[in-house]
Amino acid sequence: MKLDGLPGDVHLTYCTNIHAGESWYDIVASLDLHVPLIKAAVAPDCPLGIGLRLSGEAAARAREPDALAAFREQLTRLGAYVFTINAFPFGPFHGVRVKEDVFLPDWRDAARVKFTADSAAVLAAVLPEGVDGSISTVPGAFKPNGFIDGAADLMASNLMLAVADLAMIELRTGKRIALALEPEPCCFLETTQESIAFFENVLLKPEILGSLAAEANVNQAGAEALLRRHLGICYDVCHGAVEYEDLVAELGNLRRAGITVPKVQLSAAIRLPAMTTELVDAVMRYNDGVYLHQTIVRGAGGLTRYTDLPDALAAFRDGRAQGEWRIHCHVPVFLADLGEIGSTRADLESVLAMMRRGYVSSHLEVETYTWDVLPQQWRTGSKAADIAREIAFCARRLVE
């Protein structure tokens, strides 16, 4: 939904990756099931924005003319509109082991380019006039895969193909869509500073810009302008908090580097000010076996990164991993804590306060996709009711 009273043209939504379903049929059905309830709670008198999650399979089907026509009719009937797409997970995202497979295919793979193009075609077809679009995507690759010889340049070259496609869409339709790389712990782009370095040291290299110039039939200066217009960063507040970033400062650093933030994901992580033996059982309840729960420990020697929660717990039992823990597990933003387990909600509140003061991004998306694996005590109502509660919490903080 559009939020009035904030700097810029700001839209708030939730991401439908919370709903299980990989086929286009499943996704359409989930919208019919959940959107009316959420809209009635948070946007009864105005259109409800939707952050649409598409799998690779669904994106390929959804862009077909008959599917698009039916989807437009469905959105009209629901009183909803789509302004952003989550094209991060390509395959199954619920009910199976996801872990590091969520990053595949990564930006070394032509399948990622096609998935992004399919998603862009869908978004361009349903994006309301006068509203920009965004597509969030994997942060290059899982860290070990991103540092193989030649990987960075290959990912950059494939990203240039995506930028050229988005530039062509704008030329053809007048609709601007930006692709947004989403930094995540233990990935090729993990921190804001790594993201800025990738733009400055890889994407802006003459040979990389030259490939975009050739693809888009522009000169080098035109290629850089297209790059900055159609490629930016999706800042996930949970991810930034897990990295112990000064979120407000890093969002400012992106702006000073000339890197856009097409989307901010409003989310919170688990925080333990000091890990203790007494907390092990409570922490283990979040070891769901489905998602990767990267854990970063801040101790006397600085930050130590663990790819998954079991790795951090094993280190703790071995006498290591002493200090503050932050765990990549999206927890409800309306909860200040989860009993004896803390939350990084204070980091989220600092970003929301920043947004009240000045423009940060046009697209704000609540993204607690873990409802199905959270301990039952934190599922306070129906899924639709909990989603609505998260949207309402963020909306209140943004306009108060």
Show where each model-derived region lies.
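Aromatic-lined glycan-binding groove of carbohydrate-active enzymes
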Residues: 250-333
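Positively charged, amphipathic and often flexible ligand-engagement surfaces
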Residues: 80-83, 87, 101-103, 126-131, ...
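Active-site glycine- and acidic-residue-rich loops that bind
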Residues: 59-61, 185-194, 238-250, 272-274, ...
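Flexible, acidic glycine-rich loops studded with aromatic residues
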Residues: 299, 304-400
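Active-site acidic/histidine proton-transfer and metal-coordination neighborhood
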Residues: 2-3, 96-232, 242
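Active-site beta-loop-alpha junctions enriched in small/polar residues
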Residues: 17-19, 53-57, 87-90, 138-142, ...
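Catalytic core of soluble alpha/beta enzymes
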Residues: 198, 212-226, 237-250, 255-276
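N-terminal pre-domain/capping segments
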Residues: 1-130, 134, 161-164, 225-234, ...
